Amino acid sequence: MASDLESSLTSIDWLPQLTLRATIEKLGSASQAGPPGGARKCSPGSPTDPNATLSKDEAAVHQDGKPRYSYATLITYAINSSPAKKMTLSEIYRWICDNFPYYKNAGIGWKNSIRHNLSLNKCFRKVPRPRDDPGKGSYWTIDTCPDISRKRRHPPDDDLSQDSPEQEASKSPRGGVPGSGEASLSHEGTPQMSLQSPSSVANYSQGPGSVDGGAVAAGAPGQESTEGAPPLYNTNHDFKFSYSEINFQDLSWSFRNLYKSMLERSSSSQHGFSSLLGDMPPSNNYYVYQQQQQQQPPPQPQPPPQQPQPQQQQAPTQGPSNVGGAPPLHTPSPDGCTTPGGKQAGAEGYGPPTGMAMHPPPLQHGGYHPHQHHPHSHPAQQPPQPQAQSQASINSTGFAFPPDWCSNIDSLKESFKMVNRLNWSSIEQSQFSELMESLRQAEQRNWTLDQHHIANLCDSLNHFLTQTGHMPQQGGSHRPPAPSRITDSCALTSGKPEPSMNQVNSYGHPQASHLYPGPAPMYPISTQDSAGYNRPAHHMVPRPPVPPPGANEEITDDFDWDLIT
């Protein structure tokens, strides 16, 4: 017994029987010895018999439920049931619904599957309808000897590479390589890749820190081609592109190196300014203070007390919110608002002027409409003594800024550090809305600002530091008077005091950089190409272009300004 078992385990007599020819002969003899209908007993999804038909017994079994046959088998049964061995698509639908009632109420998804099987299965072939045969639609028949090389309606991906170079070039967006990773082969069979870099990559590829395009394309860093550009396509189909020949680790390293160099190149121009913004708190903390000034009572009462307390509470509802309604930085207001003294009306900057710091909210909203200027002009005539006292108290804390705080990078860094040491929880949020908008736009741009926005941000900080007393206030910058035409936002009488005219720009757009008090900004701003936009009551009205500050001739204005109010 044991000897027989050992001999059976070590016997290799069965090895010659496992040849391919013996297996085919065994399968052929089994199919001939089996019953004729044995092919119909196969499981769903298996290859169907081209000559299979549906018997009445099998049709009766599946009258109540879903049949177990695949869609290809159902199509085969339907076509073989016709005398001509061909059917149209509508006839196939009708035959399936008549023999299998399940599909009558099964929706239309199975019809899509029937169409896909007819189109993609190579066992089915479309036969054009003869001219003498009236009707609609082509016939479908069963191809007993399907051609494996016959292309279907939707060829696989490997057949797409058989197209001519002209067709592939026409499909690409620029007539060249469709993507940066498209491959081309030389006649020697060495895989090479031609990288068509976009314009952004071409701009940043200059400089010592950039990665060579050939190194990225070839998959290995440091390798570049000294010959001419290789042909984009090769018509020799014997050399197929193989992804196994590419070292993806080196390729991904090259792309990461290229991306890093592009970031360094793009941020080099803004490095001097954006680097000092890394230690700043988030933009929602950049609020100005007002409670410290309001807590200090004025030493003397106002001469005409025409500003009641209820109006202070209702004043914020007259215009947009201070933060949300702030105008953008890139649209400075026109320079046509001048006073009889020759000083710019909006020279005090984004918020209310220094003399109005005790009551900024009503004066801000009071200056929003032209007809509201007159009742709010007299309360603004208070002396600046409380402001001077508050500035002195703040300067005593050691937070005073140098006069040249924005002249170089080092002083600007120190200024930001001093601002970070402020108690931001005790600062009012409503006075310096333009500084909030400047910082919000800078954060949206990821602090990659151009020269114009950097200057605007410096001017906003300059005005904020001047108003809060952290930087000594210098004398106002006088300018020659603009043309005598005064816009509706500055339509005040010449007898009104200067602080009441400064309140007009509390909701206006920021003025040019050279109009603010204090030291000159880091970058000058040209005011000739700045189209002005003012905010009247609840809608935007475009302003006519404003002449340069030094223009001596007067421009006639035919616009009916009374229609705005």
UniProtKB/Swiss-Prot annotation:
It is found in: Nucleus. One of its GO terms (molecular function) is DNA-binding transcription activator activity, RNA polymerase II-specific. InterPro entries: FH_FOXJ2, Fork_head_dom, FOXJ2/3-like, TF_fork_head_CS_2, WH-like_DNA-bd_sf, WH_DNA-bd_sf. Residues 368-377 have a biased composition (Basic residues). Residues 66-143 bind DNA. Residues 296-308 have a biased composition (Pro residues). The modification N-acetylalanine is found at A2. Residues 45-54, 187-206 have a biased composition (Polar residues). Residues 207-222 have a biased composition (Low complexity). The modification Phosphoserine is found at S3, S46, S161, S164, S172. Transcriptional activator. Able to bind to two different type of DNA binding sites. Plays an important role in spermatogenesis, especially in spermatocyte meiosis. This is Forkhead box protein J2. It comes from Mus musculus (Mouse). The lineage of its organism: Eukaryota, Metazoa, Chordata, Craniata, Vertebrata.
